[in-house]
């Protein structure tokens, strides 16, 4: 028996057929961090980065990326998302991004939440690279998912 969901018995890639699955409310939460120098963090916090507001465009980029996940990730289903939220928190040496994606559908939204975080953090890098080319994007991960056959899952703290 083949346990790989995206590979058929002949080894050919395929998109999983989710047509027979029940529609349920699904939520995924992802998180990641971008580390930077204190001066860079201060400039972003005060809105004085060379490109202006950094977090506004990063939030929009994350939302847009979640909506395009099916175009970016091979064999990922294109989804009609009900909601995507992208939030930022200043931490000691950087910015933490948390994205929540949700829908009522037949497949999960983990990849959409992860893509939102990834692109939001990449946008912060792009908007602030004139100040700090050594920024580090790290620890992008799924922290929670709810819904579907497997129910609720939470990452260990």
Swiss-Prot record:
Biological or metabolic pathway of the protein: Cofactor biosynthesis; molybdopterin biosynthesis
EC class of the enzyme, as a word: lyase
EC assignment: 4.6.1.17
Biological process terms in GO annotation: Mo-molybdopterin cofactor biosynthetic process
InterPro entries, A to Z: MoaC, MoaC_bact/euk, MoaC_sf, MoCo_biosynth_MoaA/MoaC, Mopterin_CF_biosynth-C_dom
Record-annotated active site: 126
A GO MF label: cyclic pyranopterin monophosphate synthase activity
Catalytic activity: (8S)-3',8-cyclo-7,8-dihydroguanosine 5'-triphosphate = cyclic pyranopterin phosphate + diphosphate
Pfam families: MoaC
Keywords of this entry: Lyase, Molybdenum cofactor biosynthesis
Binding positions for substrate per the UniProt entry: 75-77, 111-112
Keyword Transit peptide: no
Transmembrane segments: none
Keyword Aminoacyl-tRNA synthetase: no
Biological role stated in the UniProt entry: Catalyzes the conversion of (8S)-3',8-cyclo-7,8-dihydroguanosine 5'-triphosphate to cyclic pyranopterin monophosphate (cPMP).
Oligomer and partners: Homohexamer; trimer of dimers.
Family under the similarity heading: Belongs to the MoaC family.
PANTHER family for this protein: CYCLIC PYRANOPTERIN MONOPHOSPHATE SYNTHASE, MOLYBDOPTERIN COFACTOR SYNTHESIS PROTEIN A
Stated name of the protein: Cyclic pyranopterin monophosphate synthase
Organism this protein belongs to: Novosphingobium aromaticivorans (strain ATCC 700278 / DSM 12444 / CCUG 56034 / CIP 105152 / NBRC 16084 / F199)
Lineage: Bacteria, Pseudomonadati, Pseudomonadota, Alphaproteobacteria, Sphingomonadales
Gene label: moaC
């Amino acid at each position: 028996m083949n346990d790989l969901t995206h590979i058929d018995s002949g080894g050919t890639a395929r998109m999983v057929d989710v047509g027979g699955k029940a529609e349920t409310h699904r939520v995924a939460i992802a998180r990641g961090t971008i580390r930077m120098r204190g001066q860079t963090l201060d400039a972003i916090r005060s809105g004085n980065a060379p490109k202006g507001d950094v977090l506004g465009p990063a939030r929009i980029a994350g939302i847009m990326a979640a909506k395009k996940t099916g175009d970016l990730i091979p064999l990922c289903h294109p989804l009609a998302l009900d909601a995507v939220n992208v939030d930022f928190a200043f931490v000691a040496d950087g910015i933490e991004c948390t994205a929540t994606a949700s829908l009522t559908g037949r497949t999960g939204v983990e990849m959409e939440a992860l893509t939102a975080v990834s692109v939001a953090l990449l946008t912060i890098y792009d908007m602030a690279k004139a100040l700090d080319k050594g920024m580090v994007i790290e620890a992008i991960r799924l922290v929670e998912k709810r819904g579907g056959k497997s129910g609720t899952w939470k990452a260990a703290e």
